[in-house]
């Protein structure tokens, strides 16, 4: 059963939109893209960042919106880069992250999907545990070439079914269960 309500994904990141669109389409929800730079506070909390972005998106467009904020949290460097993942990727990149790590390579991706309309503000979280590879492998965007999910020998960039196991998929699945039954 396909919902045909207008639901807008607001972001400046077209990669996140394309992944989210593919995932939500498979779950029965049509998504449209509004490219926009949203207000982003500096915070150690993905939830706080996501709430501000969702409210900003709704106030700009006056339409039901979802936004996504995520982070890569690496255990051996106290959860860094965490909510600063985008900035760190732009400045030091995957090579810089690989150069920081010695032995403990445990990491996790966390995604926060936030829905906002006139009366609702809802957060949906997804987490995927894994580790950081020793070298970049595969072709993908962001940290995909260095993140290896638990129970895999391949990086996200090498995995064909990433959209069925990612942190983003888990958060969007929770969102779709709520949205289709609200």
Go through the PLM ranges and name each one.
Residues 2-8, 15-182:
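Anionic-ligand binding patches
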């Amino acid at each position: 059963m396909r919902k045909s309500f207008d639901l807008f994904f607001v972001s400046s990141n077209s990669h996140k939109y394309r992944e989210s669109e593919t995932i939500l389409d498979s779950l029965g929800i049509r998504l449209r893209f509004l490219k926009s730079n949203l207000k982003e506070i500096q915070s150690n909390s993905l939830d706080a960042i996501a709430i501000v972005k969702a409210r900003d998106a709704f106030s700009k467009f006056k339409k039901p919106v979802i936004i996504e904020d995520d982070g890569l949290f690496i255990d051996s460097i106290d959860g860094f880069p965490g909510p600063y993942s985008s900035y760190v990727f732009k400045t030091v990149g995957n090579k810089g992250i690989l150069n920081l790590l010695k032995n403990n390579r445990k990491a996790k991706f966390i995604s926060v999907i936030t829905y906002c309309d006139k009366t609702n503000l809802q957060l949906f979280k997804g987490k995927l545990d894994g580790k950081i590879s020793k070298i970049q492998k595969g072709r993908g965007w962001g940290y995909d070439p260095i993140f290896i999910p638990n129970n895999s020998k391949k990086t996200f960039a090498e995995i064909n079914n990433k959209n069925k196991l990612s942190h983003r998929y888990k958060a969007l699945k929770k969102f779709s269960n709520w949205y289709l039954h609200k």
